Curated annotation (Swiss-Prot):
Its EC number is 2.6.1.16. Homodimer. The keyword Transferase applies. The lineage of its organism: Bacteria, Pseudomonadati, Spirochaetota, Spirochaetia, Leptospirales. Pfam families: GATase_6, SIS. Keywords: Aminotransferase, Cytoplasm, Glutamine amidotransferase, Repeat, Transferase. Residues 287-431, 459-600 form the SIS domain. GO terms for molecular function: carbohydrate derivative binding; glutamine-fructose-6-phosphate transaminase (isomerizing) activity. Its main location: cytoplasm. It comes from Leptospira interrogans serogroup Icterohaemorrhagiae serovar Lai (strain 56601). This is Glutamine--fructose-6-phosphate aminotransferase [isomerizing]. Coiled coil: none annotated. It is an enzyme of class 2 (transferase).
Length: 610
């Protein structure tokens, strides 16, 4: 959600911070700002809107200096405007603070500070932080001690960075439940909410753990725990290339990432499947003996990852015969679920920082339940705090609406299900070999779908004024219908709902008119005739039918107003192929309606608040 950057070195801090904020744009934001230390003064520059608006402001009011912090804000408290934008300062602008997360007790703290004469300018929870630091300094505390004292006063999950005018060469930082990284360059240090701003200049990085704080200057870095004990951090080599974050000639990250899916599948298949069709997960630390005893799996996820988990439930129950429940992380943690020793919690998160999923993992570990997470960022908090993790291996995903991470999650869940079936002796070598051979054909089939993207582009041009969409699917493709609806409303702002085909007559059919497009996912399968019945019901009520069918299909195609054919495959693999035209439909609908597909309004790539 919010993005934090910081810098101390020889370069112009304003330029470094702005470039860093641009790298964090994909996380979602509504305002941006920086604070730069200049000869003992803190120069705060911030604006509502995009980074380009901040850059325009900086051309008029530059912020010279070599040390500073910056922030992109995604509003949680107070509307998006310049006053509520970060950084925030104390009464006399002696300290500036940027913050990601939520201060849950800010109203109580604000009331206490007002009684002591503090005057607040914004409606944010963040503004209490510089005033708390100011109050500590009034009581004779040093900058360092004031910063440390702050952590015991605030409740919630957060990351903070601060600069003081009396220490013009130093940047302070801390985190308790929200991600922060330190980057080490040549005679300079960087701070960021994720790896993307650090790829150009940093040779090594350190992932700050929850409950750690510290400070850095041009040539100094110190790290402590919340008790004040000094720590000895180990920096890791930074391996992500700047080119990995480039659009690669595509107009948007989303369409680039859609087109990367075949290559990602080739990579996963090559790394996960041996020549003898054996499936390997070398990163899983839990023993095969422990995994073979698992008799229940609870999948925790949010958004698109939740729908991937729903497909994973089908796979795990079908192949490994393990009772599997898929739950929204935000709901699981607020009840008292019945779990036993041989239950496995599986958290799914692209970023590895999803706040609700992380909280659910903490809940599971408090009950002594083993956790294996499926994450795209193996250095993330969720990966570090799980007993083990599985690499999604989708590569950096910058577009806010997840595409390639979704299909990579589904493929990994399928392979993990076969792996678990093998541990439990529930699949023969021959059965596994046949299935693996079909999986190996997926990349070429994805390429064939993407080669027909222009058909979806033309189709989407007919629905620029549509106000509602309905998506229908059954069994494995019910979650695909829900994911297709989510994608469309996320980036084209068209209201859309996804339903199980069997539930259509139980309410949603009342919405059908000649102005409502209905996407029917109807590949050849055991329940194909049921989907054809849905299509006939829609046609009888003059609904607009868009069908996704298997190549060569005539029955469903003849009943449809628009049709897109996917290569033939088993029902088990059909979700992977069926979702790709829905991703394209969402993308081209957004373009046709003039919506920004990479930065849809109100959305954040990494949801780090609960």
């Amino acid at each position: 959600m919010c993005g934090i950057v910081g810098y101390a070195g020889k370069k112009n801090a304003e330029s470094v911070l702005v470039v860093g904020l641009i790298c964090l744009e994909y996380r979602g934001y509504d305002s941006a700002g920086i604070a730069v230390l200049d000869q003992g003064d803190i120069l705060v520059r911030k604006s509502k809107g995009k980074i380009k608006d901040l850059e325009a402001y900086l051309r008029e009011f530059p912020a010279p200096g070599n040390v500073g912090i910056g922030h992109t804000r995604w509003a949680t408290h107070g509307e998006p405007n310049q006053i509520n934008a970060h950084p925030h300062t104390d009464t006399n602008s002696t300290v500036a603070v940027v913050h990601n997360g939520i201060i849950e007790n800010y109203l109580e703290l604000k009331s206490q500070l007002k009684k002591k004469g503090h005057v607040f300018q914004s409606l944010t929870d963040t503004e209490v932080l510089p005033h708390l630091l100011e109050e500590s300094k009034k009581n004779g505390k040093s900058n360092k001690d004031s910063f440390l004292e702050l952590f015991g006063k605030i409740h919630g999950k957060w990351a903070i960075s601060s600069v003081f005018e009396t220490e013009p060469d130093r940047v302070y930082f801390a985190q308790d439940g929200a991600p922060l990284l330190i980057g080490k360059g040549k005679g300079e240090y960087f701070l960021a909410s994720d790896i993307s701003p650090l790829t150009r200049n940093c040779e090594e990085v350190y992932y700050v753990n929850s409950g750690e704080w510290g400070y850095f200057s041009q040539n100094e870095f110190k790290l402590f725990d919340f008790s004040g004990k000094e720590l000895n951090p180990t920096f890791k080599k930074q391996e992500l290339r700047w080119e990995d974050l480039d659009k690669g000639g595509y107009p948007h990250y989303m369409i680039k990432e859609i087109h990367e899916q075949a290559g990602i599948f080739r990579k996963i298949i090559q790394e996960r499947i041996l020549e003898n069709s054996e499936i390997v997960f070398p990163e899983i630390k839990l023993s095969k003996d422990v995994l073979s005893r698992v008799n229940r799996i609870i999948i925790q996820a949010a958004g698109t990852s939740y729908y991937a988990g729903m497909i994973g439930k089908h796979y795990l129950e079908n192949f490994a015969k393990i009772q599997t429940d898929t739950e929204a992380s935000s709901e699981f943690r607020y009840r008292n679920p019945v779990v036993e020793g041989d239950t496995l919690i599986m958290g799914i998160s692209q970023s590895g920082e999803t706040a609700d999923t992380l909280a659910s993992i903490h809940e599971a570990k408090a009950k002594f339940i083993k956790v294996v997470s499926l994450v795209n960022n193996v250095n993330s908090t969720i990966a570090r705090e799980s007993d083990s993790y599985i690499r999604t291996d989708a590569g950096p995903e910058i577009g806010v609406a997840s595409t390639k991470a979704f299909t990579a999650q589904v493929l990994n869940l399928l392979l993990f299900s076969i792996y678990m079936a093998n541990l439990k002796w529930l699949i023969s070598d021959e059965e596994q070999k046949i299935l693996i051979e079909e999986i190996k054909l997926l990349p070429a089939k994805i390429d064939r779908i993407l080669a027909q993207a222009s058909k979806i582009e033309e189709m989407s041009s007919h629905f620029t004024t549509a106000k509602d969409f309905i998506f229908l699917g059954r069994t494995y493709n019910h979650p695909v219908a829900m994911e297709g609806a989510l994608k469309l409303k996320e980036i084209s702002y068209i209201h859309a709902s996804g339903y199980a085909g069997g539930e259509f007559k139980h309410g949603p059919i009342a919405l059908i008119t000649n102005e409502v497009p209905v996407v029917c996912i109807a590949p050849k399968s055991e329940i194909y005739t049921k989907m054809v019945s849905n299509i006939q019901e829609i046609k009888a009520r003059k609904g607009i039918i868009i069908s996704i069918v298997t190549e060569g299909d005539q029955e469903a195609k003849s009943l449809s107003d628009y049709c897109f054919e996917i290569p033939e495959c088993s029902e088990i693999l059909s979700p992977i192929l069926n979702v790709i035209p829905l991703q394209l439909l969402a993308y081209y609908s957004a373009i046709a309606r003039g919506c920004p597909p990479d930065q849809p309004r109100n959305l954040a790539k990494s949801v780090t608040v609960e």
